[in-house]
Amino acid sequence: MKTFFQIFMAAALAQAASAEVKVTVGDISDKRTTGKFFAGLEIELKLSGPELADAKGIRTVVKDATDDTGKALKKAENRFRGDGFEELQKSFGGGFGDKKADEFQMKLEFENPPRAAKAIKALNGSVELLVPSKDPAAVITASVAKDAGKPLENATLKAAGVQFTLRKPGKEEKKGADFGFGGGALGESELGYVISDPKGKVASVEFCDATGKKLESNGSTSSGFNNSKTVAISLRDKPPADAIAKIYVVTEKSVVTVPLALKDIALP
């Protein structure tokens, strides 16, 4: 059962005007079981609004959630990303010119509610958006040709505790180098990087041409653990020789906060 909510954005910065963000509750997956695996409650949120067009990262902060039996619901631990920012994901069906092209989705995961619970009575918190246009320091640009193969030197990355190395196109990384990963050779239509980000400060990484236009991709693969990983991005076409990487880093000035207050979310 789907319920609809609309909330309004109060800008976190004085120079940022308020913007409307529509939040729709999508699919709800409720797996109440006594087992340790595949259990839990997953709530899909769909977001749309003008502020999202410039956003490069998103995360949710849940202050409290209570079901209709009065029990507090505990947010499930994200073993892969922790509480850091994530890249925005298009809603299924979006990106191909249909009505969902400007709609994004995210998921909230909670531990099992009681079997008697029929709804989430209240869910309070916030959605935080990384909007790089609010702070030039939030965007770091590097040349693949000039900077690949060595740790990127940058004050913002250093302050965030991030180590970042662009992979050399077509070159195979030495096993054990940098962050303990063995990297296989990149294909002629692939670009990649190696990152250690213990605080979850890097929201996303894009590869672009020299003019800043994002290179279209078919997806990515990654390996790693403990906030360190090796990533390969498969591009639709062979990347240009002057390709650049744009690294989007969370800074205090770049974050816009959307208050979140949802009520009476029916459970399946």
Q: Where do the model's predicted regions map?
A:
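Sec-dependent signal peptide recognition
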Residues: 2-10
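N-terminal signal peptide c-region/cleavage motif recognized by signal peptidases
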Residues: 14-16
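Alpha-helical, hydrophobic structural elements that either
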Residues: 18-268
